[in-house]
């Protein structure tokens, strides 16, 4: 059984990470949450909450899923950034551009070809992370037939 940490530090992270939590538990693996400076909006249906760094280290996740561009680098497991928005180019060339590489992630999960291409180019340039086009966890379920 693999273990996955769902790292949330913005309120919108709940909607992005819950579909991943569902997929993790449906395949028989274990998930847990860590909330950083946001209100606890977890429900009974959600995986357990780890409230300390020590608890995260004891949980020892294989991977940490993160919808934002920051995660503590001392958390165990590979760091996976999960994309959730469109790149509309509004911050191109700035420190906050869509494809900014901060050196924190081992894998970038992109939602579509445009973003994937940008990150594949950066992966080739920097050489310390991989890119996988995985879809959009928040919207993909809405597009599935019932």
Map each language-model feature to its residues.
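Nucleotide donor/acceptor-binding cores
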Residues: 1-3
């Amino acid at each position: 059984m693999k273990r996955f940490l769902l790292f949330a530090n913005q309120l919108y992270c709940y909607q992005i990470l819950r579909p991943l939590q569902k997929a993790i538990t449906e395949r028989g693996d274990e998930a847990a949450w860590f909330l950083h400076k946001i209100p606890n909006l977890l429900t009974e249906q959600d995986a357990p909450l780890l409230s300390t760094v020590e608890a995260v280290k004891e949980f020892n996740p294989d991977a940490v899923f993160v919808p934002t561009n920051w995660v503590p680098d001392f958390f165990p497991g590979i760091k996976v950034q999960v994309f959730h928005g469109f790149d509309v180019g509004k911050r191109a060339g700035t420190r906050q551009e869509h494809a900014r590489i901060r050196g924190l992630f081992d894998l970038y999960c992109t939602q579509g070809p445009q973003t994937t291409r940008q990150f594949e180019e950066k992966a080739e340039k920097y050489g310390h992370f991989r890119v996988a086009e995985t879809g959009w966890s928040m919207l993909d379920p809405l597009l599935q037939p019932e």
